[in-house]
A protein has these predicted regions:
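Residues that define the transmembrane beta-barrel architecture of outer-membrane proteins
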Residues: 27-29, 60-64, 93-97, 110, ...
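Membrane-embedded beta-strand positions of outer-membrane beta-barrel proteins
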Residues: 31-35, 82, 101, 114-118, ...
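Outer-membrane beta-barrel "beta-signal"
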Residues: 34-38, 197-211
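Transmembrane beta-strands of outer-membrane beta-barrel pores
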Residues: 37-41, 86-90, 103-105, 118-124, ...
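Outer-membrane beta-barrel translocator domains and adjoining extracellular loop/strand segments
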Residues: 43-51, 92-98, 125-133, 175-182
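Glycine- and aromatic-enriched membrane insertion/assembly motifs of diderm outer-membrane
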Residues: 50-106
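Extracellular loop and loop/strand-boundary signature of outer-membrane beta-barrel proteins
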Residues: 51-56, 85-87, 102, 131-138, ...
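Repeated loop/turn-to-beta-strand initiation elements of outer-membrane beta-barrel proteins
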Residues: 77-80, 109-112, 154, 158-162
Length: 211
């Protein structure tokens, strides 16, 4: 985790140094504050001690997120940023730190964009109480994260822009659950005794202000 954080900080420093050497009339430092909502997609297959499927859990998680980015626009079509934020799930929360690459397809007031985020999500908190419906605890460990999206940037003036995008997110983390033990009381509503890795998928929208 420390190596990931150091790598991302070093990347931002490299962006700053490179930007100072390659300035153009349209180059500038940029900041963006954004927030959004995404809903869970797909299924998670849980295994028992013998490697057989125990049950399938629907990804009913949701993700409410807020981010801040600091970066550099090299020209009207390309920018790179370092981002950090908070991701709030139903029973847990993450602090993602990531590198952002954004491509603008035009240099007009209304610009179609494509962006890609990649980094690592640290834990903020997690509840140990299983979900009442599925009797699992989602998102219990740190892990790599990614996001991609397409949208529209609306340039209000030379400094301020609105960004609206449809996004797809994923988070690699642990899911905790209970493997039934014969002749023992079922405590799956209160605790867990098994854990496995899972890749969570989300789709949603992001709204931001760049300045």
């Amino acid at each position: 985790m420390k190596k990931t954080l150091i790598l991302l900080i070093a990347t931002l420093l490299c962006i700053s140094v490179f930007a100072q050497r390659r300035e153009s009339p349209d180059s500038k430092f940029i900041y963006m504050t954004s927030f959004g909502y995404a809903t869970g997609l797909g299924e998670i297959h849980l295994m028992n001690n013998t490697g057989e499927e125990l049950k399938t859990v629907q990804n009913r998680s949701f993700d409410i997120f807020v981010d801040q980015q600091l970066g550099y626009q090299f020209n009207p079509y390309f920018q790179m940023s370092l981002g950090a934020g908070f991701d709030f799930w139903k029973q847990t929360a993450f602090i993602p730190i990531y590198l952002n690459i954004t491509v603008n397809f035009t240099d007009t007031k209304f610009e179609p964009i494509f962006y890609l985020n990649g980094g690592y999500a640290f834990k903020w908190y997690v509840s140990s109480v299983p979900d009442k419906m599925d009797r699992v605890v989602h998102g219990t460990s740190t892990g790599p994260m990614g996001e991609t999206g397409i949208g529209l940037r609306i340039n209000l003036n030379d400094r301020v822009s609105l960004v609206l995008a449809a996004c797809y997110k994923n988070q690699y983390t642990d899911i905790r659950y209970t493997i039934p033990t014969p002749d023992e009381q079922d405590f799956s509503a209160y605790s867990t005794n098994a854990v496995q890795k899972a890749l969570y998928h989300f789709a949603g929208v992001r709204l931001g202000v760049q300045y």
